[in-house]
């Protein structure tokens, strides 16, 4: 089987020739792996990295992670973005002028020129601070435009040709509904809204769902076969199962259903705590959940997760790339990868990977050993 066939077989719930070895590589690792490159690209350079090292590839394109309405102007929606570099940080201030008022968002992230496309911004000033902001947003936020839709189709065709049989592209959309809502409103306020201002919370989440579903409908009407959904903010360290099922699940489920109704797969990302939320992920109707992270990054146990939900959803991850992989001896890696693989491969529905993206500075011989052992031990 090719990497592409292998991954798609697992996502369908069938048994491949071996477990896919789908290591997650993005700008941080790629910039370290290719020190000669002035800038790295998480799709093109991930393809080259996968060819060199011999793993199965799931690229995580970020081209459509930022909504169209935050990138360009429309009628009654004038977007002005300012970028500032200061003391190793990159600040992005977006001011949106409408007939009824101005909305402003300020984000910041660590700046490194070679890996600039991989910056993960944190919001420091929020677009939706109060009910008036939401009224303005709901009234004037533009629908997705034909130019953005054309860009999606072109990018998907480009990715399909570039990746070939190495694997598949699983681009990030804007994120899960709660993730995106928490990007534009302080998460502490958002959590309290669910209890103290339910009408506001419902109106906001319904609008976010409508917009995200519309964008993902466009993403699925392309050559992309799997769509990534970031769900890391509503992790089990932040919310319990009861809160998640009542205030978050209905919206995320609508998004997942829209993607699947288009005949595409869903990849849900929570690289933190998720132990009490695993059954909720099944209720959501997801095809795949990553990263089954163990302590201290998460609170998950692969054997327990396989027994609880492994028949209903594809699991991916579990190898500690922070505290273990960067420091372990080759003999330790052989033992740990073998242990994880023998748990994950049982019954299928497993893609071997780390508990998040590979980190810069990870010894190359360690990564090669992971791939070697995972391929050998993953055969059915």
Tell what function each PLM region has.
Residues 32-76:
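Segments that shape or occlude catalytic/ligand-binding pockets
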Residues 3-8, 43, 76-81, 89-92, ...:
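Short alpha-helical segments and helix-capping/turn motifs at coil-helix boundaries
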Residues 1, 57-59, 63-80, 192, ...:
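Generic detector of solvent-exposed, compositionally biased contiguous segments
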Residues 1-37, 97, 123-380:
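Active-site loop segments of alpha/beta catalytic cores
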Residues 2, 50, 87-88, 101, ...:
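Residue-level detector of functionally special positions within alpha-helical transmembrane segments
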Residues 75-140, 165:
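A contiguous, low-structure linker/loop signature
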